A protein has these predicted regions:
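Conserved helicase motor core of P-loop NTPases
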Residues: 4-6, 28-38, 50, 170-351
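Conserved helicase motor core of SF1/SF2 NTP-dependent helicases
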Residues: 27, 37, 43-60, 64-70, ...
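Short, conserved phosphate/pyrophosphate- and ester-handling motifs at nucleotide-, phospho-/glycolipid
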Residues: 22, 76, 199, 267, ...
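N-terminal pre-P-loop "Q-motif" helix
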Residues: 15-33
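Charged, amphipathic alpha-helical linker segments immediately N-terminal to NTP-binding catalytic cores
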Residues: 1-16
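Conserved alpha-helical scaffold flanking the Walker A/P-loop in AAA+ ATPase domains
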Residues: 114-128
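C-terminal accessory regions
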Residues: 333-414
Length: 414
């Protein structure tokens, strides 16, 4: 199949020619869909055409009169948002939802450890049996617990559902895990290795980094941009980098589209510095802690008794601000709007309350009162500004312009 002339490959998508590698993977997945197997894995790094292949797969099924129900799913809300946008753009007749919603789960916090677990809300809310094909994208994010839940759901003998996992094993793994189980335990698979999505410099540098991910240090890069300077990457001194960064965040484009630009760094400390720098440039030095219209990102799950208001790394926009007191501590009562358009009420500690908050947590910990520890901690919501993100939190996102703090990124010892 590797030697197949591309002229022999039929046109599945108008104006898009599949490579011989993509065509081979497409045929392998189609064979899987006609088999009794339950699991299949498609791997490939950025630019190898995984998304195009998914588009081709669903389009070809419909062209052949196959009306099987399909759902696109991902572990995070952020990655699911990308899938939903893609499906709408291509007019695909599919559903899109998070893995939690698909399985009828709700995230809960173990009061003894503080770990996030998944709990079945109602077996009847498990939607896996309603679909013939479940596609789990960005599967590098799927941790061991979610992997078991997905496999158990699709392994029922009374349903014909099959599950296609899609991802890149070189992406960041789940927290406290070396690699997602998806890449270790699925027998049938196809791999895309040829970069085809990018025709310019970004594709070249991404391909180089991905292929040489084990080297001890990066080579010296030089700016490489298109003739009209609209695509590519720029290497510049910090002062110039910072000046352009400020210009980008104070532009009309960013005001109209919060996904227009982001800054990526490695350490939380550097992210905090960059967020303060950008806020000051936009609003001035005397600005309040929160401003209507600002974009926030959660550091941990935001809970309200038994309900999860926002997942970790979920973004939202501030639409209302009040002052208040909770547990005799001064707080910000924030009304926010999620990316799905839902309104949520968050309780965020004001800066003067932080020492007292930490002291009370330490007291509970010293006396081993863990249920009180977690109950008190969960009364308040931990959020950050979303101008700058760590590379880990940015995974699964799509931004138009990205500023990368390379010196800070190189502090990663791995």
């Amino acid at each position: 199949m590797d030697g197949l002339d591309t002229e022999q490959i039929p046109e599945v998508l108008p104006g898009i020619a599949l490579s011989s590698e993509q065509w081979a993977a497409l045929q392998a997945i189609e064979a899987f869909l006609q088999s009794q197997s339950k699991l299949y894995l498609l791997t490939g790094y950025a630019g190898t055409g995984k998304t195009t292949l998914l588009h081709a797969l669903i389009s070809r099924l419909r062209q052949q009169g196959d009306s099987r129900s399909v759902v696109l799913s991902a572990f995070s809300n952020k990655a699911t948002k990308v899938l939903r946008t893609m499906a709408a753009q291509w007019s695909l007749d599919v559903d899109c939802m998070t893995c939690c919603k698909l399985l009828g789960l709700k995230p809960v916090i173990d009061t003894a450890t503080g770990d996030q677990l998944f709990e079945t809300v109602n077996d009847q809310l498990n939607q896996v049996p309603h679909y013939r094909l479940v596609v789990v994208d960005e599967c590098s994010m799927v941790n061991q617990e979610m992997w078991k839940l997905l496999v158990n759901a699709v392994s029922r003998l009374d349903i014909a559902t099959q599950m296609l996992f899609v991802g890149d094993p070189a992406q960041l793994p789940p927290v406290n895990e070396l690699q997602s189980c998806c890449f270790e335990q699925i027998i049938h698979s196809s791999a895309l290795n040829q970069v085809i999505r990018y025709g310019g410099a970004i594709g070249v540098i991404a391909d180089d980094i991905r292929r040489n991910i084990e080297r001890s240090q990066l080579p010296t890069y030089r700016s490489d941009v298109s003739t009209d300077q609209t695509e590519g990457f720029f290497i510049m001194p910090r002062d110039r980098w910072q000046s352009l960064l400020i210009r980008a965040f104070t532009s009309a484009k960013y005001r109209d589209n919060p996904d227009q630009v982001r800054v990526l760094a490695y350490t939380n400390r550097r992210v905090k510095q960059l967020n303060q720098l950008i806020r000051t440039a936009i609003y001035g030095a005397q600005i309040s802690d929160y401003v209507v219209g600002e974009r926030l990102i959660t550091n941990t799950p935001c809970l309200d008794e038994e309900a999860v208001l926002l997942q970790t790394s979920e973004e939202c926009e501030v639409i209302g601000i009040k002052r208040g007191k909770v547990e005799n501590l001064p707080v910000w009562l924030l009304e926010v709007c999620t990316e799905a358009g839902d309104c949520r009420d968050l309780v965020v500690l004001q800066q003067p309350a932080l020492p007292d908050f930490q002291q009370r947590l330490d007291s509970y910990a010293k006396t081993l009162q863990w249920e009180l520890f977690w109950a008190f901690r969960q009364r308040f919501h931990d959020v950050n500004y979303a101008y700058s993100l760590t590379v880990h939190k940015s995974q699964g996102s799509t931004f138009q312009d990205v500023f990368v703090d390379l010196p800070n990124l190189m502090r990663n010892p791995k």
